[in-house]
Amino acid sequence: PHDGENQTNTAVTSPAIAPSQTPLPPISTPTPTPPPVPSPDVGGGASSTVPDANPEHLKNAPLYITSILDPDDKSLPRLDCPRPDISRYQYLKPSTTLKKPKFFIALNIREKADLLPRLLGSIVEALHFLGPENCALSIVEGNSGDGTYEILHLLRPEIEKLGTEYHFSRSDLDPGAGDRIPKLAELRNMALAPLVSGGPSKYAADAVVLFLNDVAICLEDILELAHQRLYLGADMTCGFDWTYVGADPTFYDVWISRTIAGDSFFEIPADGNWNSAWNIFWNEDTSRRRFFDHKPLQVFSCWNGAVAMTARPLLDRLVRFRAPSPGECFQGEPQLFCKDLWNAGFGKIAVVPSVDLEYSDEAGRKIKAAKGYTSQWVGREDEVQDFRVDWKADPPEKVKCMARYDKQTWEPWNQALE
């Protein structure tokens, strides 16, 4: 789910969203249903093991699976990604095979078959890099009609053959009908359910969650978020997601993200226009300078297309995704998640300006051309003065509430938690 789309249930108006950014799906039951395991043969004989499958999509699925599994495959179009700097990220891979998975990769997705060669291709590259046996992959799919379901279903034997634990389920939850935020929260919790239910007995004590939106992402983007979380001593690191509503990219997740001063990343007046989107961190000099210097900066909340975070508060069941409580500012589930992280003592949350993402291959090419690939901005941080974040232990006293653009208020950061 796209976090900015949480706005559709409010009086908040946002710029037109690219066609690639489709809302999540209609659904009938709120609980995910694990599909039966298909035959390893992804050819025509697999249809009997894929319930509700479209025969045409089943026929096309092997082409996508081949592309997903082979980073050099050119049969389907996708964002070109550079090979990552092995030496920079090698330390992320455990030196010995772990008895418990350390990396939990989570994803909610619907109607994104065209993006799978890049998105799932990068995830599979991450499995290989980090050690397939050290990883678990959890995907909740939302009744796609474009082949996404069939591809992800038939991918199971290939992922399991690598040695990675693969959790795949469908959900009929429709965030577009009725209250949106509770459903988006439930979908995210579904993706995390194997981690939470498995708990500390099944997952490593220092486990990491890599939670991705349906973005055009490279392996180096995923690894950089994981690296910066460790390098900075952060609890959570986010990239930056962008959208093209005109010729220039606009920061997308403005409804969710709040600066360490509690404000939105750019100013949105009462009429809801995004004309000041270019003026990011306009009222916070330190954050603005660090952003343009491509140095990570502490924030109150973020999501921004992809995050790396410690699994500790999830394993200990201190936080989960949720909707606003009575008397609490109407806000999106990722902002509430960050608020609850602060409340649980996990307030080292940072955005990483070197990781720039968009929601389609075509727009991904544009954003990488405009903002640069991650590898163009990283390296030699130890030689850069004040690269590391000077963490603030306390959250801002108040945080901007944007339940409606025409009625923005400042509320205590821990409103409804006191």
Segments from the language model and where they lie:
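Active-site-proximal specificity loops/subdomain of glycosyltransferases
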Residues: 147-206
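Cell-envelope/extracellular polymer assembly enzymes that use nucleotide-activated donors
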Residues: 102-104, 136, 336
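Short beta-strand-to-loop acidic/aromatic patch adjacent to the donor-nucleotide binding site
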Residues: 201-217
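N-proximal low-complexity "stem/linker" segments adjacent to membrane-targeting elements
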Residues: 1-6, 10, 25, 38-125
